[in-house]
Amino acid sequence: IISSHSNKAHDGFLGHSYVGEWVNIGAGTSNSDLKNTYGTVKMTLGNIEVDTKLNKIGCFISDHVKTSIGCFIYTGKRIGVSSHIHGYITEDVPSFTIYAKSLTGKSFELHKNSAMETQKRIMERRNITQTSNDKDLLSRIFKMTQDERYMFGVLKTDFSM
């Protein structure tokens, strides 16, 4: 399922997955939807591991996510709101995270204002005006997910490679 205003124009496999709104899937981004063991997919929800009892589940990509060229997302992984992902995604990614662990060994917090500016730019490309409600929603999600970023070890410093 690919929601409105999302872009998957390039090569790459995207199977048995959910993609939120305003997502850009970079060229060559692919996901796995089947474990090498052919076993059922287990996902983490909160602090609880849940057996889905399904052997085919792709990824779950939240609104405003951007994937860089050549991302590989492992089976059943969740990508949080406004995250930017790079390289191999082997674990769930919190909202507002620049995930570059396979490249730098680290993840960085995406500044809220940067997320809002990116939202504005992508909406303008579709002749849609960003509203105060759009910005307020991102602000609220940013605040609601700050503990998740802390627990994940996301660095509150500028991203660099």
Model-found features: residue ranges?
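Glycine-rich hexapeptide-repeat left-handed beta-helix
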Residues: 1-156
